Amino acid sequence: TNNICQGLLKAQLPGRFQVLPGKPRIILDVAHNLSAIHILSTSLSGMADHQKTYGVFSALKDKDIDGVVQAITSEIDVWLVAGINSSRGASSDEIVEALESVGASKANGSILVFPDPVAAYVFAYKQSTINDRICVFGSFYVVGKVMEYLEQEKYG
């Protein structure tokens, strides 16, 4: 993960509201604190029409998960909670609890839990239509893993 973080920092800040070409619209943002999440939420709300937004999300334990979720919940229709394979990662249960506190629910399908960011992203991509968008956010780890996957898919 340290190599991923270093690579992201060196390369013109990819992962900061990085919108990939094509449909569905894919947004990568390493936003992981309240200030950055407010900017991400504002940027998402200013985007052109879309039907559904899938949020591939996870966070580290030391982040304000409740505040982050509260700040962006109006922009996310389906939360795809992705596990972080690190002792610093928040548990899926902690994230689900924060999401349930703002009205999302496993029962109604607005929260789905995955073992890792790539599994969450692949699910979102397969479920989405060309009119939807997928926002991958919450940490350098989550965005980095999805970026690695996309590079492998692109270049084999």
Show the residue positions of the predicted features.
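A general structural signal for well-ordered alpha-helical segments in protein cores
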Residues: 14, 37, 53, 92-95, ...
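Short glycine-/acidic-enriched loop or helix-start segments at secondary-structure transitions
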Residues: 37-38, 65-67, 91-92, 145-148
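Residue-level signal for short, function-critical loop segments
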Residues: 59-61, 83-85, 140
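C-terminal helical cap/extension that packs against the catalytic core
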Residues: 25-27, 34, 69-133
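Short helix-capping segments at alpha-helix termini
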Residues: 47-49, 102-107, 154-155
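Nucleotide phosphate-binding/pyrophosphate-handling subdomain across enzymes
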Residues: 1-78
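Glycine/aspartate-rich loop-and-adjacent alpha/beta segment that forms the canonical ThDP
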Residues: 140-156
